[in-house]
Regions:
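Hydrophobic/aromatic beta-strand patches that form the interior of the parallel beta-sheet core
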Residues: 19, 44-48, 65, 287, ...
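A short beta-strand-to-loop transition that corresponds to the Sensor-1 phosphate-sensing loop
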Residues: 21-25, 243-245, 357-360
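Conserved catalytic network of the ASCE P-loop NTPase/AAA+ motor domain
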Residues: 10-16, 56-60, 231-234, 279-280, ...
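Conserved C-terminal RecA-like helicase domain
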Residues: 94-354
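Short glycine-/acidic-enriched loop or helix-start segments at secondary-structure transitions
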Residues: 2-4, 29-31, 251-252, 298, ...
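Post-DEXD/H (motif II) to motif III coupling segment of the RecA-like Helicase ATP-binding lobe
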Residues: 2-62
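Conserved RecA-like P-loop NTPase helicase motor core
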Residues: 259, 275-281, 287-445
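Charged, amphipathic alpha-helical linkers/stalks
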Residues: 65-68, 75-107
Length: 446
């Protein structure tokens, strides 16, 4: 890695004076990475805020927007099924007299555990007391005082999840419980998808959260944003969609309406937007720029060849079922590195209003100051990577000093009346990712 070479260079040169300017400090990285950063650059002496950089003209004025969507009907059904399984399991365990016997055997109820040990996990202690209360069993006053709660809430799925996590995994030794009973209960929970990697999941399942993060409702969000931005900016629009996957299997769907393109990825986005553009009879032209596939409008062929010049060779071919007079697939002969700059050049000249690519472009040091709108259709939650992506849209452009930029973040949420009832950590993993992403952006608070 490049940083190893830099560290080695630093070791071998004496009396170095280092001036370090970092656009994106690794604030939310691992401790090891932060230590490495500090060893190389030294303590931070001054932090220049984004508003200061905008004021002095180093960055263009910009605005972040969060575009929320609800799950699709099918996704909502899957969420409901998970909730129903959790509720049914809670009710089943509440009726289980054997479970009650085992819970009452907990060492904390017979004074065998110290206060400090019991308070290591107050939420778990609360779940034990709430369970006893729900079974109309007197709660030891010492434990309730220890918890500092005059009144305990009713038993629900959240408290059952905490109780089962301790009973089945984290606090096994505190119970006088038959091993076979515990194994059968684990098998029962697993069969309902309520255990993932030795973690009881009755409120937030990784499988359900992944489905919501990848919600197909985000396709509609992207469609809405693209046509809204085009309505506002017309042919001056230079919109970049950054996502995580190419989805090459959708190449055969391009120009073939028999195929459904509801999926999150470069090629599904391209075809979805192209079809909608055709239906609306709009004049938006789209492009794709990835390491393994490049698509340009057919009328941009000559401009691309001029931009490439003598730096490389390319071939042009049909893409999917589209006519060669509509869009072209561009393939480099040999090393394709030169193609990125050439496509960026024709994008900046207006041969395309919307460019779709993967975040791997950032690793190639890619830049295009013409971008005036960015859709982050990526599941990156870290500040560092998010800021690198945002940075592509907030560059100043000397040819257009009046440039401003919009940055769009996509989040899938349950209907708002359900969100209001949920704890912050139960809203959705997608929402939590947005919070992590926004943590260090000045002025953005969610």
């Amino acid at each position: 890695e490049w940083w190893k070479a830099l560290e080695e260079f630093k070791k071998q040169v004496n009396n170095l004076k280092i001036i370090a300017l970092t656009a994106t400090p690794p604030y939310d990285s691992t401790p090891a990475m932060w230590t490495r950063y500090m060893n190389m650059c030294g303590e931070i002496d001054e932090e220049i805020t984004i508003p200061e950089l905008v004021k002095e003209g180093s960055l263009c004025p910009h605005q972040d927007y969060v575009y929320f969507n609800y799950p699709t009907k099918e996704e909502e059904k899957e969420v409901r099924r998970f909730e129903e399984r959790s509720k049914a399991m809670t009710e089943k365990i509440m009726r289980d007299t054997q479970f009650l016997t085992y819970v009452r055997s907990h060492k904390g109820f017979s004074g065998q555990l110290s206060d400090d040990l019991l308070l290591d996990n107050p939420a778990y202690l609360a779940s034990l007391l709430i369970y006893l209360q729900s079974k109309n069993i007197a709660i030891p006053s010492r434990l309730q005082r220890l918890l500092g709660a005059k009144k305990l809430p009713d038993m629900n799925v959240q408290w059952m999840e905490r109780l089962l996590q301790g009973f089945l995994y984290d606090d096994v030794d505190s119970y006088l419980c038959d091993k076979t009973y515990r194994e059968l209960l684990i098998a029962d929970l697993k069969s309902d998808g309520l255990i993932e990697k030795k973690k009881v999941v009755m409120t937030k399942s990784a499988a359900v959260e992944k489905m919501l993060t990848n919600s197909l409702g985000k396709c509609n969000s992207i469609r809405d944003i693209v046509f809204h931005e085009y309505e506002a900016s017309g042919q001056d629009l230079r919109l970049l969609v950054l996502t995580d996957y190419i989805r090459k299997e959708y190449e055969k769907a391009i120009g073939n309406t028999e195929y459904d393109v509801n999926s999150l990825g470069v090629l599904p986005f391209f075809e979805m937007l192209r079809r909608d553009n055709e239906k609306k009879n709009e004049q938006i032209r789209f492009g794709v720029l990835c390491g393994t596939i490049v698509i340009i409008p057919a009328e941009a062929r000559e401009a691309l060849e001029q931009a490439i010049g003598m730096s490389g060779k390319v071939t042009f071919s049909r893409i999917g079922n589209l006519s060669e007079t509509d869009y072209l697939k561009v393939t480099a002969v040999g090393n394709a590195h030169f193609l990125t700059g050439a496509v960026t050049d024709i994008f900046s000249k207006g041969y395309m209003q919307v460019l779709i690519g993967t975040k791997s472009l950032l690793g190639e040091g890619w830049d295009s100051p013409c971008i005036n709108s960015l859709i982050l259709a990526s599941f990156v939650g870290s500040f560092m990577l998010s800021n690198q992506m945002r940075g592509r849209a907030i560059r100043v452009m000397k040819e257009h000093p009046e440039k401003t930029s919009n940055i769009w973040h996509l989040v899938c949420l349950r209907p708002w009346n359900e969100v209001l009832k949920a704890d912050d950590n139960q809203i959705s993993e997608d929402y939590s990712m947005l919070e992590r992403r926004m943590e260090h952006f000045l002025g953005l608070h969610y």
